[in-house]
Amino acid sequence: MSASNTAVSDRLRELGIELPAVAAPVAAYVPAVRVGDLVYTSGQLPFVDGELLAAGKVREVSAAGQSDSQGSVSPEQARDAARIAALNALAAVDDLVGIDAVERIIKVTGFVASAPGFNGQPGVINGASELFGEIFGDAGQHARSAVGVNELPLNTPVEVEIIVQVRS
């Protein structure tokens, strides 16, 4: 956690961040599973109040500053979506073990629905990684994969899953 060893719930309040309700699974799985001192989340989408924050593939914005009209998502919009998906992952952890049980973020895997030629996946998934740093300080530093894919469920631009270490 942070240098002051503040409880995670206190740090969230300091930052003005409220964890959302756990998103309902869209298929046959559970949001999170605990094995020993690790919690694995299922892939989380950027749902806000039951609605996807954005939809479509991520592509660079044109020189005129506009995305094309084919359901495109800008890298900046996708970065925001990754942050929301990360919050949803934390909500799944909170629902299973309580957010104050989290010792550290171990691994983040981020999937980015990418238009042909888009290779900015690391920058998109930074939306999740930076959130974990804000909340957990050094304990938010983690191993990570940022993977470009052709399609994601429900036409979401990003999906984030995490592995966290919790108190035994």
What are these model-predicted stretches?
Residues 2-168:
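Short, polar/acidic, helix-capping and beta-turn segments at strand->helix junctions
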